[in-house]
């Protein structure tokens, strides 16, 4: 494996008597598209929040971009991009205002901010929509804008939490083209999803069940391992014994 940009060992998160994430371990290589899969309630979002510096682990160890998830959450936040299920955009601001807001948060200098803003608007073909309120945009457009804003500062890693929920298959495929573009530029992509067909787009995937990583490998490897014709079959095999329900 190439040099890992994310490394996790026995990482756990407990809330009282409930163990949301249970001793997970894995590495993610630089430039990899890593799928973090599992049903709702499996612990994916909780694990991602720890890796993003938004929540501290109960036990275990891990690093993201060289920083300790137990002690250096604030430093991690400055080195990553993050896109939540709700796209992290402000509906009452225009497209351009959202871009400028996040450029400022990321600390981009004015000249660089202007250059990257123009590039972003051109790539998305959003020049005519620059003055449009984000709240009035179609869902698929919001999705593309949110991803582009999350990677505006060219982070080493971008974390995507269920980014394609609620959109049609064609729009999902278009969104994945943006992911491929970011990965080709050297950004590591860590994406959670419960759409098993999207696992086929990843370099490697892990599958969480009841807070634990039950499978890890390239999609083709996992399908061979479980004698399955699709990642959906792999997931169903693993999920049969799940104790958690939504």
Predicted regions and their residues:
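ABC ATPase "signature
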Residues: 216-217
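Conserved catalytic motifs of ABC-family nucleotide-binding domains
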Residues: 154
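Conserved ABC ATPase "signature" region
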Residues: 100, 104, 111-129
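Catalytic Walker B motif of ABC-type/P-loop ATPase nucleotide-binding domains
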Residues: 158-162
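Conserved ABC transporter NBD signature motif
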Residues: 60-71, 75-76
């Amino acid at each position: 494996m190439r040099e890992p940009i994310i490394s996790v060992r026995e990482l756990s998160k407990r809330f009282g008597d409930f163990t949301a994430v249970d001793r997970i371990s894995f590495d993610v290589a630089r430039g990899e598209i890593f799928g973090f899969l599992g049903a709702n309630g499996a612990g994916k979002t909780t694990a991602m929040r720890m890796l993003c510096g938004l929540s501290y682990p109960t036990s275990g160890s891990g690093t993201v971009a060289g920083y300790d998830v137990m002690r250096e959450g604030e430093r991690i936040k400055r080195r990553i991009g993050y896109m939540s299920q709700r796209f992290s955009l402000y509906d009452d601001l225009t497209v351009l205002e959202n871009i400028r807001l996040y450029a400022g948060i990321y600390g981009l200098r004015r000249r660089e901010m202007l250059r990257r803003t123009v590039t972003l608007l051109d790539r998305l073909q959003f020049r005519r929509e620059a003055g449009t309120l984000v709240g009035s945009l179609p869902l698929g457009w919001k999705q593309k804008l949110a991803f582009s804003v999350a990677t505006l500062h060219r982070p080493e890693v971008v974390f995507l939490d269920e980014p394609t929920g609620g959109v049609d298959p064609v729009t999902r495929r278009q969104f994945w083209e943006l992911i491929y573009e970011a990965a080709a530029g050297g950004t590591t992509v860590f994406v959670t999803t419960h759409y098993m067909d999207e696992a086929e787009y990843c370099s490697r995937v892990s599958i969480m069940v009841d807070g634990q990583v039950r499978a890890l490998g390239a999609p083709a490897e996992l399908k061979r391992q479980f004698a399955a014709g699709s990642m959906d079959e792999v997931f169903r095999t693993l999920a049969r014994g799940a104790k958690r329900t939504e």
